[in-house]
Amino acid sequence: REGAVRTEKRSHIPITELRVAGGGSQSPGAMQITADVFGLPVSKPHVYEASGLGAAIDVAVGLKLHPDFSTAVEEMTHLGETFEPDQKRHALYNDIFERVYKRMYKKLKPLYTEIREIID
């Protein structure tokens, strides 16, 4: 969530929805938690293998089946299930984020740096 907050600040563009693909998108529980944590609707694509769909879109544009990527994406992708945030749970997660996570991350940052040094 912290990354999303930073992205919004830097871009000055609010994030209004999330799209999730891959393994986590197959878990209704994980999708609902994501919606609740971010306080945003979270949708998954109509296909499981989003990378395969991306490759198919590339091929479709390359073969001139669609005139451009925007058209190909619009015609070849569809939303699957959407999970709406539960505002009561979002308020709880937000409280944890503001009161605990932000402080915890600052205190752990030196340890993350040390791990990076060990790995490098």
Residues covered by each model-derived region:
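Glycine/Thr-rich phosphate-binding loops that ligate phosphate moieties of nucleotide
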Residues: 1-120
